[in-house]
Design a protein with these regions (language model features):
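Extracytoplasmic and endomembrane cell-envelope/extracellular-matrix remodeling and assembly machinery
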Residues: 27, 39, 51-53, 59, ...
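Acidic/histidine metal-binding catalytic segments
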Residues: 57-58, 77-80, 135-144, 162-164, ...
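Catalytic Zn2+-binding segment of zinc metalloproteases
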Residues: 113, 123-140
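Membrane-active amphipathic alpha-helices enriched in small hydrophobic residues
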Residues: 140-158, 163-175
């Protein structure tokens, strides 16, 4: 993604943050209205940003989010957590429990507690309804229209609108930032308390804010203050440090975190979002110089992923074997081995490993999905379909699973069912026009099973409702 494109996307979603943050005049947005706007935002994000939705990445970030929510308590929304490709150091909480993490933020992290601290902070924004409470019913329609305009900006044709947004928001800079600072303090306070309840080390909040301060200082000359969703890290850092000092006697209750899963997740994200030569250099330096054993070992995992991406499969397997020797009980590394074998076209070896791995952990959707792909490539489409349906039930918004199902049906000559699955694939890829086109065809095709026709009709009706109401 180019620097201009990244800045444009950042501008769009920061404008979204501010657009939903006007001071309350009368009544706050209702839960139903917030959920509807959240759905619209998610479709826009899917269209304009690349979501890293591989099952292992998705399951990890959502599992961590669920751990935080267990101490938060019952919520109005079903929270969903996403990783999006952007080199920006940022995360944001959209309405209705949608929380997005930029890959640039994940790159800056070094341990799981840092990620949990940001997760908890963003959940704090949502539970406090910082966005929804500032939009009154009298401005709901114009704010919803503004969301559509913001989605248009993300397409790269801002025109007059960008100048209009910049000028009007700059004029209201002080009040917008004043409210934002209050929200940040409340979210930090909630995050700190939840981390204590989880026995996580809240010093990670301090570490993240120091990193944010460094990056903000570095970029401040290029990014106006009113374009920052999380302003004033200096004040936040002072506040968090005072909390740490106040609770310093509780440090013995903090549990040491196993960072294996985080480090694996981090490299899985980075290998898809950063320059591979630069990442290789980083891994080599970490392997040679880092004093933390897990960080050093998992740098070799990063090298294995890089070799696999460069189709140096033998070298990748050699690197991974060294990592497996240091973590012999980590089943996910066996899945990673099978994925490299799959990429190399060694399907029989990959299948044997994946069968055993899925048997050990049937909840691992990454292993299950990769096994389905191997079965399909080997001509075992019946079993592949069964496995893919399992993944689809567990991850109903994962687009690639519907693409694979559509391919199977198309190869069987079942074009109607293929169009149905292709419609869902396009839907969750953010390509609404193509989704509607294929779902309409599937709905009219008499060869398509009735339950699929009904689901297509339901999706089309929901899309029409969202577009009409927002």
């Amino acid at each position: 993604m180019s620097a201009l494109s990244t800045l444009r996307h950042t501008f769009v979603y920061i404008m979204l943050f501010v657009a939903l943050s006007w001071p309350v005049q009368a009544y706050a947005l209702s839960i139903g209205e917030e959920r509807l706007i959240g759905q619209k935002i998610l479709y826009s994000v899917r269209k304009d940003l690349r979501i890293l939705d591989d099952p292992d990445i998705n399951q990890y970030i959502n599992r961590l989010g669920s751990q935080v929510l267990q101490v938060v308590g019952p919520q109005y929304f079903d929270y969903r957590f996403f990783v999006v490709q952007s080199d920006q150091f940022n995360a944001f909480a959209a309405p209705a429990g949608l929380v997005f993490f930029y890959s640039g933020l994940i790159e800056a992290m070094r341990k799981e507690d840092e990620l949990v601290s940001v997760l908890a902070h963003e959940i704090g924004h949502v539970t406090s309804r910082h966005l929804a409470q500032r939009m009154d019913k009298g401005t709901k329609v114009s704010a919803a229209s503004l969301l559509l305009g913001l989605a248009g900006l993300a397409l790269g044709v801002p025109g007059l609108s960008q100048g209009l947004f910049t000028g009007s928001l700059a004029a209201g800079q002080t009040i917008n930032l004043r409210y934002s600072r209050e929200d940040e303090e409340q979210a930090d306070r909630l995050s700190f308390g939840w981390m204590q309840e989880m026995q996580r080390n809240p010093e990670s909040m301090q570490d993240m804010l120091r990193t944010m301060r460094r990056i903000t200082r570095y970029r401040m000359g290029n990014v106006p203050q009113y374009l920052l969703t999380h302003p004033n890290p200096e004040a936040r850092l002072d506040y968090v440090e005072s909390l740490l000092e106040l609770h310093s006697q509780q440090s013995s209750a903090w549990t040491k975190t196993d960072n294996f899963d985080f480090l694996r997740f981090r490299y899985r994200v980075l290998v898809q979002t950063t320059d591979l030569d630069r990442l290789r250099q980083y891994c080599a330096i970490t392997l040679a110089q880092d004093k933390d054993a897990d960080t050093q070992r998992m740098a070799r995992f990063g090298l294995a992923l890089i070799d696999a991406q460069n189709r140096r499969f033998d070298q990748a397997l050699e690197q991974l074997a060294l990592v497996q020797g240091q973590y012999p009980d980590r089943n996910i590394l066996r899945v990673d081995q099978a994925v490299i074998l799959q990429m190399a076209g060694r399907f029989n070896e990959a299948k044997a490993i994946l069968d055993a791995s899925v048997h050990r952990d049937p909840t691992d959707m990454y292993g299950l999905f990769k096994l389905a792909q191997v079965e399909a490539a080997s001509g075992n489409t019946t079993r592949a379909e069964v496995l893919l349906q399992q993944v689809a039930r567990a991850m109903p918004e994962y687009p690639q699973v519907f693409f694979e199902l559509g391919q199977i049906e198309a190869n069987r000559g079942a074009s109607g069912k293929g169009m149905f699955y292709l419609g869902k694939y396009y839907l969750y890829q953010g390509q609404e026009d193509l989704a509607v086109q294929n779902l309409r065809r599937a709905r009219r095709d008499t060869s398509v099973p009735k339950h699929m026709q009904e689901e297509a009709e339901q999706i089309l009706a929901e899309l029409e409702h969202i577009n009409k109401e927002t």
